[in-house]
Amino acid sequence: MKNGFLAAVLLTLGTLAFGARAGAGPQNYQGPEPEWTPSMVKPCDRACLVGFMDGYMNAIFQHDPNAVPPLARDVRMTENTAELNIGEGMLWRSKVEPTSFKIVIADPVFGQVAEQTRLKIGGQDALVAIRLKIDRNRIEEIEQIWTRGVDKTAIPLLTTPRPGLVDDVPASERTSRDVLIWAANSYFDALEGDDGKIGAFADDCVRHENGYQTVNNPPPGGRMMPSPMLPNASTPQGQEQLKISMMTCSAQISTKILNFIKKIRPRRVLVVDEQKGVVATFPFFVEDGTRRGGDPNAPPGMMLNLYTMETFGIRGGLIHEVEAFPFVTIPYGLNNGWTEGAGH
């Protein structure tokens, strides 16, 4: 995860500079917002929510803001934390093409749907997360996160989503909404507490970060961080990294290798899909920029925050899959574009 902080900073700064909010731009409002009455309450089930997401993504692929499904008058959109109008930003202004990797999480209870996907942006592989909030059958919120520079070594795990993140859970085996939310929050509790026993982890839990498996790797080990380079087994440091890469989700966190994280606020456990047993979160990792490393002469840590989407496959109250991407770094003190006061 730490390498994700370093690798994403230039991409983030480029996005923040891509364009500020300017002009109204094309907006598919479909008339003035009517006065609300109880008769306007229409259910939007899972298929309805997925339809909104598919319609939105197709509009992006077509470069046609007018093809976006109906929008609320006060619709709000951000891209990598910057507030923009529909039709602005990298996803709208670049050539964007779909790939075979797509995870869709839909929550009819709170009217939210999220997609975690690999796209082609300008011919380059990119990792993208999008969240829509639907109210009265209109899109009220749009949140977009993306990063490019995906190395070819990450593509094998970004070709087909794991079944535990896309398959339906049999109705008789589904986990309650409350337990799904609790399990997702326990992951962040474990990270903040540097204690894997706090988390509701299954023994076979596997975490993927930016397309790399960083835990529970089979012998002789693999990556313990999302980096194209494998640890060098001929060095003591590489041997230790290989050892950590083979640990379970719980045991790895307990080594305190992630103690550079000061806090995770807000966590934003936003989309709970009981049908799939999957929870989508949009956490904000605040790094401790005052902590020094082992060398007393080393400079303080980098003052960066990390913004991402983390998706959890949860069955029987335990986390079996973690899919984390894209990693976008934000200068310390800036927030996620949705939560006032975040970033410190």
Enumerate the predicted regions with their spans.
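C-terminal and inter-domain tail/linker signature
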Residues: 21-344
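Bacterial N-terminal signal peptides
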Residues: 7-17
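Positively charged n-region of N-terminal signal peptides that target proteins for export
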Residues: 1-4
